[in-house]
Amino acid sequence: MKWSKLIRGINVVAFSCMALAVLLPEIVEARLRVVATTTIIADTVQQIGHDKVTVRSLMGSNPHHYKIRTEDIRHLSQAHLVIYNGLSIENGLRRVLSQLPKDVYIVDVSDCLPKKNLRSSHQFDDHHSHPENSCGYHYDPHFWLNVNHWMVVVRQIEKSLKVIDSNQAHFYHMSSNKYLGQLNELDQYIRSQSEKIPTNLRFLVTSHNALGYFGQAYGFETDGLMGTEGEETSIANLRRLSYKIMDQKLTTIFWDNTTSRKSMQALQESILAKGHKVSLAGPILVGGVLDSRQTLQNCDKHNHSTYDGMMRHNVDTILVHLTPSRDDGN
């Protein structure tokens, strides 16, 4: 009798598994196929769409080094929705995007931001040269580093999902509202952490000069070894930055996850050789969220595979290294 019940139970489980195996492809197929160029856009789509979407990110955590692959073109062509940054990051993709099938809905999220809110790349690195974007302007593409700008983008992504999937409009709206509440808390967190740093110490020197929007929003002056487009630096710029760091009496510089740490080590060594003590800290996450399989040394409590966690990690890293210790007598 016991054996009979056991066998019946096994059969039920087996049948259930077979049914699930048959239904699963249909469930996955029913989801919106969304391709996002950056990991930050992909994370935001996932936060709004949840199980209604299947999201693929193309560029990884360092979009400046991205090179398009054949499989990327296939995913783009098969997508219901393609969302991209729009400001120079995807220069290598523009031709491909223009040739996608007409039934692929394509969204440039930078279009939702007033041009007056976009930073000219020259405002932060006049000493670098820049390739022009398709409009002939030189906009800094790292607007996600100002949380208030990214909250505008959240609404744009919500609208885009509703255009493609109007039956789930209420779901996307409620998810968007919830996520915006989380981002409002994030913005307040960054402000409160930044205010703990003395005003005269709020100077961020990074390997890639990507923190212009962050600095404007949260009260920091910024500079970098490489420009906003991630182009290589020059000996002249390394010398300029060395003397600026010494003149400002800065004691910490930062490396970020889009460039090799070696470039900032070279800057640090140049400054140390001149008799000025400066430490190297990081990484600051500027290019995108990390893959869930990636880890950071001295990992903090934040989830670096989300936009929220990335931004919290950044401000906490800055706070730790720019706040005077008690040993300094401050």
PLM regions and their residue ranges:
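Bacterial N-terminal signal peptides
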Residues: I10-L23
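Extracytoplasmic metal-acquisition and chelation regions
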Residues: L24-N330
